[in-house]
Amino acid sequence: MLFLPSSPWWGKQISLTGSKTVVLWALGGYGVSFTLLGLGSVLMATGAVTKAVGLGILIIARIVYGLTVSAMVPACQVWALQRAGDGNRMAALATISSGLSCGRLFGPLCAAAMLVIHPLAPVWMLMAAPALALVMLLRLPGTPPQPTPERKSVSLKRDFLPYLLCAMLLAAAMSMMQLGLSPALTRQFATDTTTISQQVAWLLGLSAIAALIAQFVVLRPQRLTPVALLLSAGVLMSSGLAIMLAEQLWLFYLGCAVLSFGAALATPAYQLLLNDKLADGAGAGWLACSHTLGYGLCALLVPLVSKTGVAIALIVMALFAAVLFSMVTVFIWRCCKSK
């Protein structure tokens, strides 16, 4: 929840101090956060501190994470946009999205491999990762704060809300789909939790691969306009979730891939459309805030939806969010067409 107030604030700092500076701050916060997390875990495991003290250290670690790491993705996106230039903005955003997808794909594999060494080895890896990133980033040229063009606003306006609503609905739909995988798979595997866990891992891996394909095949070559991407994303997301309602396992996998492919098209599309109206730093910050709102909305709805006892209830709710997303994209298309 700390992402909500901190993301827009960091967006303003990007415009004031430059994106590289903000990325370095975010990496520093990332390193401090996981150092505290590892320290608290070790102290509690060895009995050096009471559980209350150890829990306090872990809470402080998460607070540091929420207040600083919220700057990471927006700052990286703006940095990539500024270095790429106006003609390659979509490809720049696709590069950042590709990095995130690779992290989702290989992160769990790295963690599983590190567990062979020690139960806390994944935390050690997270402590070392920001130091390695800092070494690489310090050598890259930074970009000075960019003046905001007169046609762009520096503050949020009512006209920008459809783009933020798209971001919120996308995050909510994807979160509910991921949380709904295990309940939905009980239709095929009943209470076999081991098999269900394996299937969820395969589905999440497939989701990351589908997103990578979208980013390399569609986004990086810049084959479609942002509005066309947004409309395509709505259709693909709704279609994918509708396919996932089927009981056949192969259709469930197909639907997950179609959904993830469509979702990968959406984020660069609404970010580019918003950046045409709002300063890059402010736009990235508000979109990050909207994504967090989507995750929060999902967290609020999950207990209510789960009470229905229907195995695919969360998938149905995700489909509803995707349909709303599609309706908003049509509204954006009509607004752009009228201009």
How should these model regions be labeled?
Residues 48-71, 168, 251-265:
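Hydrophobic core of transmembrane alpha-helices in multi-pass small-molecule transporters
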Residues 29-51, 236-247:
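C-terminal ends and interior cores of transmembrane alpha-helices
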Residues 179-199:
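Short amphipathic helix-loop junctions that connect adjacent transmembrane helices
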Residues 61-100:
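Cytoplasmic helix-loop-helix junction between adjacent transmembrane helices
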